[in-house]
Amino acid sequence: MNIRNAQPDDLMNMQHCNLLCLPENYQMKYYLYHGLSWPQLSYIAEDEDGKIVGYVLAKMEEEPDDVPHGHITSLAVKRSHRRLGLAQKLMDQASRAMIENFNAKYVSLHVRKSNRPALHLYSNTLNFQISEVEPKYYADGEDAYAMKRDLSQMADELRRQMDLKKGGYVVLGSRENQETQGSTLSDSEEACQQKNPATEESGSDSKEPKESVESTNVQDSSESSDSTS
């Protein structure tokens, strides 16, 4: 399974995945809008045959008086590839890209009040908090929870990893002990290794604004089903 940045020629297959998984669907111009405006923020999951089995469509909110923050427009994983943690990986990758490219402080999304599996994913796995209820947010009149995830902890972790890389180390995990003694790494503490220059790599549910509401009623999750809007 591979997670990678979405390319323009992925958009048709992302739309197809959306149609299979979610009741909130978008015209192709909406995918193009995201892809052209924020090409760094949307990701796809593909299987061993290169077929798209999940995606996250994301953007930055354009509110000049607010702190920089991102928004998850849509997240879906095909039924055949659920319970593999793909939704969490897609969400984390999009959030990291928001921090690295736009210095985002938090990320937001909307989810149907009735979508218990997605709420479980966002609240229990990804640490989103409900910020408010938006009445009749969806085209069928259902209310949405507006949710936010603070990105300061992830930003600190990314800075730490960058500092380690600058010092000549590659981080092998997300919460490793940063201390080494001499050139020896003990089994219980360090999860960093000296870089090898030869092998180092470079590098929601919706209406259309009130044409379009986003769909984050995820159809996947490490636990059950994920989706967002």
Swiss-Prot record:
Subcellular location: Cytoplasm; Nucleus
UniProt-annotated stretches for the region Interaction with NAA15: 1-58
Extent of Polar residues compositional bias: 179-201
Tissue expression: Present in several cell lines, with highest levels in MCF-7 cells (at protein level).
Pfam families: Acetyltransf_1
EC identifiers of the protein: 2.3.1.255
Compositional bias annotation for Low complexity: 214-229
Catalysis performed (reactions): N-terminal glycyl-[protein] + acetyl-CoA = N-terminal N(alpha)-acetylglycyl-[protein] + CoA + H(+); N-terminal L-alanyl-[protein] + acetyl-CoA = N-terminal N(alpha)-acetyl-L-alanyl-[protein] + CoA + H(+); N-terminal L-seryl-[protein] + acetyl-CoA = N-terminal N(alpha)-acetyl-L-seryl-[protein] + CoA + H(+); N-terminal L-valyl-[protein] + acetyl-CoA = N-terminal N(alpha)-acetyl-L-valyl-[protein] + CoA + H(+)
CDD domains named among the record's database cross-references: NAT_SF
One GO MF term: protein-N-terminal-glutamate acetyltransferase activity
Gene Ontology cellular component terms for the protein in this record: centrosome; ciliary basal body; cilium; cytoplasm; cytosol; Golgi apparatus; NatA complex; nucleoplasm
Subunit field text: Component of the N-terminal acetyltransferase A (NatA) complex composed of NAA11 and NAA15. Interacts with HIF1A.
Function as written in the Swiss-Prot or TrEMBL entry: Displays alpha (N-terminal) acetyltransferase activity. Proposed alternative catalytic subunit of the N-terminal acetyltransferase A (NatA) complex.
Protein name: N-alpha-acetyltransferase 11
Organism: Homo sapiens (Human)
Organism lineage: Eukaryota, Metazoa, Chordata, Craniata, Vertebrata
